[in-house]
């Protein structure tokens, strides 16, 4: 009897020990997942230092800003953006940007910015105030970040929470296929979403993107986009169109048209969402007007 009792006690102690160990592992794992957030208050400004600057092309650069510690993440939900603000020539300038780095990355955040220099574009002789200011920053100098901001949040597995305006409650929209229309730097929120979807093995949402630019040299994040297209050919389809295509160009030419949308985006459906980001004339005339013509419901469209 004593041997049996001792054995039972040992078994009971072993079970308790394993249970406690599993609890501790789960608790520690849960804590490890919750990295400290940088953006705690969407109305507060957080000065972040420039820690690296990399030239991507003749007029495009990657700016890496340091977070408060190597353990911090930015804290930006997928679909949201940040505002950068700075006093430039005595005036406050504010611009919206979507990071290209994942929000799971610790210690830093990356922005890809096209720098609009003075006396290059006839319509904008002064160039871009914020982009030139960013380009002028020296390593260690700071700029104010504010966020998260935006009316759209991607939850998971095709679920979007979309607010009609800042005062409204979000409405849930579920999509099996996401159509995307991007122009120029409007590609950044699209890449953010594409990465989130394709990196989640449990997310079967499909994405189809039409990316419009003036020339082949203007295509931002081309390597990143084509890498995803090659590694997820059934889930992500990519199509370019250029105003001035080079000889032998195998993609589209000219503005985004109804025929182009019909060929490269999913057809209108209740389980289709179409996202747009680019210059206002493109959004209105090339995107919205053609989507209306093709019968895409307004409830399934969103322009960043």
From Swiss-Prot:
The chain crosses the membrane at residues 9-29. It holds the Pfam family FAD_binding_6. Its cofactor is FAD. One of its GO terms (molecular function) is cytochrome-b5 reductase activity, acting on NAD(P)H. It is a single-pass membrane protein. Keywords: FAD, Flavoprotein, Lipid biosynthesis, Lipid metabolism, Membrane, NAD, Oxidoreductase, Steroid biosynthesis, Steroid metabolism, Sterol biosynthesis, Sterol metabolism, Transmembrane, Transmembrane helix. Coiled coil: none annotated. PROSITE patterns: FAD_FR. It catalyses: 2 Fe(III)-[cytochrome b5] + NADH = 2 Fe(II)-[cytochrome b5] + NAD(+) + H(+). Its main location: membrane. Its EC number is 1.6.2.2. NADH-cytochrome b5 reductases are involved in desaturation and elongation of fatty acids, cholesterol biosynthesis and drug metabolism. This is NADH-cytochrome b5 reductase 2. The gene is cyb5r2.
